[in-house]
A protein has these predicted regions:
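Basic, flexible Lys/Arg- and Gly-enriched helix-loop patches that mediate nucleic-acid binding at interfaces
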Residues: 1-233
């Protein structure tokens, strides 16, 4: 059981102060009866809470998919650059959201933004080995030596990388699948072969892939089917 004002405020549309004002004005009902106190408790999964006659759709956690554009940092706040949270639709910003993982400021593609710490751990923890798929464009042609080296494990100054799959898709383009996430890892791996990464885009995480119709900068909720794909091992 939780306090009504906490339940409503947790959904991100109203602050607890605003919820108390709504209740005082008789605009909130619980199971069909007007509420008179914000301290009353209810089971958020079972109770029917309405605001101005409209049922509150309670969501314990929120899961958003963002097509990250260049220029945004993967953080909740930053003094120098805009953050990915600034791309979240206003109706979700009242929740304690954070990016599940990071992409460099000049990297684009799929990001998950959530308030579910358990899910974030499950898709980011090294022991989980969740594959992440990237599109890469280089300044020089992709070579067989790169492919073989990635599969064997590239040695960086912070250790040997786990085996990575490299699929050449064009003269200077490839898809890379990683199962770990080191700092600037793909850029450093190609740097070992004298190549510079000029474009980097994340296409997928686990079994979830970036939809072709989600434009850069767009952010929306995951569908139940997409969430299930993200959680599959």
């Amino acid at each position: 059981m939780e306090r009504i004002d906490k339940i409503i405020a947790s959904q991100g549309q109203y602050s607890r102060k605003e919820v108390k004002a709504l209740i005082a004005k008789g605009r909130v009902t619980l199971d069909g009866r007007p509420l008179t106190s914000s301290s009353e408790k209810a089971d958020p999964a079972a109770a029917q809470i309405c605001i101005d006659g409209k049922p509150l759709e309670f969501k314990r956690n929120l899961y958003l998919m963002l097509h990250k554009p260049k220029g945004y940092v993967s953080a909740t706040e930053d003094r120098e650059h805009p953050t990915v949270l600034e791309l979240v639709p206003p109706e979700f910003r009242g929740r304690e959201l954070f990016p599940a993982g990071r992409l460099d400021r000049d990297t684009t593609g799929l990001m998950i933004i959530t308030d579910d710490g358990v899910l974030a751990h499950n898709i980011l923890a090294p022991k989980k080995h969740i594959p992440k798929l990237y599109h890469v464009q280089l300044d020089i042609p992709v070579t067989d030596a790169m492919r073989a080296g990635f599969l064997e494990g590239v040695r960086l100054n912070d250790g040997v990388c786990k085996a990575a799959e490299l699929l050449r898709t064009g003269t200077c383009t490839a898809q890379v699948t990683l199962r770990e996430g080191r700092y600037h890892q793909i850029k450093r791996m190609f740097g070992c072969y004298g190549a510079e990464v000029v474009e980097l885009k994340r296409l997928g995480m686990g079994r979830l892939y970036l939809p072709e119709d989600l434009e850069e900068g767009a952010c929306r909720e995951l569908t139940p089917a997409e969430l299930a794909l993200l959680q599959k091992r």
